[in-house]
Amino acid sequence: MKRRYWNINLPEMMEAGVHFGHGTKKWNPRMAPYISAKRKGIHITNLTITARFLSEACDLVFDAASRGKSFLIVGTKNKAADSVASAAIRARCHYVNKKWLGGMLTNWSTTETRLHKFRDLRAEQNMGKLNRLPKRDAAMLKRKLSALQSYLGGIKYMTGLPDIVIIVDQEKEYMALQECAILGIPTICLIDTNCNPDLADISIPANDDAIASIRLILNKLVFAICEGRYSYIGNR
């Protein structure tokens, strides 16, 4: 895999608070190699290591995007949800930012059935068919459509399993990480100082609680994806 320059610099990461970890009492000893110091009861992540792994992740997604591969970005906690959606939309990736439904990937046939139902309901609403139903029936279907939009809206165009999954919070999205491991789908994961760096294919040590930190990491990754997509289009 060719190494490229992704303009990842330490001052920018420091300004975004990427280096701030959890309290020293709430940590995973396996994160020791990625921690550079303790400050006021908080672990500080080694940003040189963060930059290295983020650069590797950017190289990986660039290469995948340049070959037309698909991506899924997962981050359902409140601080990550908006950044996940905007980053995914910008790079034309699928995303889950509300709730991970168990079996979303490992039981893909069920997910596919839900997606077909979701698309059918959206089509009926767009054609005005729901407004012709009795009020009670229309209200029930609109509630169902709203729920499907919340949970499946980010994957409504997904027609098969993703080639790479990017996960914002390892602890919060552990179920998604497990499903990827079962299916052999490569994962890129933001890991804070309370995480296990061995669970993802590429683990990026970073603050997964600060919006600015999450946004910075995602911006670098989706920029690399977009560059890869341009390369793919140019080579077709």
Curated annotation (Swiss-Prot):
One of its GO terms (cellular component) is mitochondrial small ribosomal subunit. It is found in: Plastid, Chloroplast. GO terms for biological process: translation. Keywords: Chloroplast, Plastid, Ribonucleoprotein, Ribosomal protein. Its main location: plastid. It comes from the Eukaryota. The keyword Ribosomal protein applies. GO terms for molecular function: structural constituent of ribosome. This is Small ribosomal subunit protein uS2c. It comes from Dioscorea elephantipes (Elephant's foot yam). The gene is rps2.
